[in-house]
C-alpha cells in the first residue's frame, strides 16, 4: 500500500549530468569551511591543519547554473554583505561508513563546480556569538552547481585551476591542489562521523579572494576540466 501525505511532497532536487539525459538526485548538501590556507587567513582563522569543520545547506538550495544558461539569482533578504565562494564539488554514489582515505575513491560518483553563496554579515554575527551558521549559509538558492562529471569520464582530479570572476574581473584564482584537507581525507572524516549515502553532495571549500556582489553583477567561475557556472544577481 502506497503512503499518503497531508500535502504533496516537494519535487526531488537533482543535478544535471554532462552528456546525459539522467539527473543526479540530491540527498543532502555538506560543506567544509576554511579548507584553503590563504582563505583561512583572510577570514581571520588559524590555517594550521586542525580537524576540518562542516556545515550544511538545505537540499533545495541547489541551483543548476551551467555557464551560458543565463541563470538569475535574486539578491537575498536580510543581508547587506552578500558573498561568493567558488568551490569544487564532490558527489557520493555509494554508502560510505568508517572509511580510511585510501578506501574512498569507490564511493565518489563524480565532480562538479559550485558557488557557496553566503550572507556574510549574518554568518559573522552567528560566529561572534558562537551560534550555528544556517542563516548565513542555508538560504534559498545558495548552492550554485554545474553539470556533474562522472568519475568514469574524468577520474579523480588532483590538480586543476579553480577560478571566479565578477563582471569579467578575476577575483579568485587558485588550484585544488592547495586544499588543506584532500577529498579522500574529507570523505574519510565524514564517514566516521555519519553514514554518507548516494546523493550526498560535498562542497570542498573555497580559495582566497572571496568578496561581495550586488544586484546586476555577473558572476562566473569554474574548475578546469570539471565544469563552469555563471549567474546574474537581480
What function would you assign to each model-found segment?
Residues 206:
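Switch II (G3) loop of P-loop NTPases
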